[in-house]
Amino acid sequence: MRIILGIYSILFVICSISVAQTENEHASLMSLVQTERAFARTSVAKGIRESFLAFFADDGIVFRPHPVRYKETVANTPPPTNPLAVTLNWEPLFADVARSGDLGYTTGPYTLTDNSPEKRQPQHGFFFSVWKKQADGNWRVVLDAGIRTPELYSGPTKFQLAPRLVKESAESRLEPGEGKEMLLNAECELMEVAATDGFVKAFVAHISKDARVYRQGVQPVIGIDSVRAFLSKRPFTQSWKPMKAEVARSADLGYTYGSYEKKERGAAAAMEKGYYARVWKRDATGRWHVVFDVANPLPSNESE
């Protein structure tokens, strides 16, 4: 009887810890989404510049078109005379956060509206932001990118939470520093397989079943079958060089960004150059999967 009671006590403790971790993770995710929405409200009320300065980390990166630190870039730039001449508004539709609650990302549709006398047509697209919890406990953007789409998004508007891929276990825990090394190894493995098997085959083999791929001029491509079909439309090869990788304390979520070069199959010259950003997520077996990928091509005059 004592043995049975002991087993039940252990199971109760394990279940309690699991529930507490799930609740903490959900709370972190909701706080991230609330911060994203506050960011958007500030943008509409006070303008793009002021909102970005308020919600970006000091080392937060944007692509203009090369990666730069936003706060450093605008530090010596005079503020606009009318900060609301153009308004940027957005709404998160999808978000995920690491189990440790210190790193996450959000994405959703945006609209850029011209309020000047010219009243140019609104621009539409999808934003993507990586957030990191700072020492003061606040979420701040560490990387921001996006795509422009030809028309307003008309798909599902219900907010979605990312599916959980990692279960807390002794086998899935990593020592500090191991997560980043493993993530970079996964990125290198993807590059090696792409060099032999082709980018599309390699990429599809390394993504999650519900992965999201963002490319300029088209609506988001979601799901492994849709991604395979989209990338297979035109034969090409792709190479890339990671510039940075960062992983959550729990080592279940991380991101990379860097430069890429895209060529038509058999061609010597690149048909497109630019920068990519990629979110990776680790499953219960310890394997990393790409869950999000966005490309920011350089203007044609810079790609030559």
Predicted regions and their residues:
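Positively charged n-region of N-terminal signal peptides that target proteins for export
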Residues: M1-L5
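Bacterial N-terminal signal peptides
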Residues: G6-S16
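Short, low-complexity N-terminal intrinsically disordered segments enriched in polar/charged residues
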Residues: V19-E50, A54-F55, P150-K201, A205, ...
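A solvent-exposed, acidic/Ser-Thr-rich amphipathic alpha-helical stretch
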Residues: H26-V33, G47-D102, P122, V200-A251, ...
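Short, structured motif recognition centered on aromatic/hydrophobic residues
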Residues: F39-A40, W90, L103-T107, F128-W131, ...
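Generic short beta-strand segments
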Residues: D58-D59, T107-D114, Y257-K263
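Short beta-strand edge/turn micro-motifs at domain boundaries
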Residues: P122-L161, K273-P299
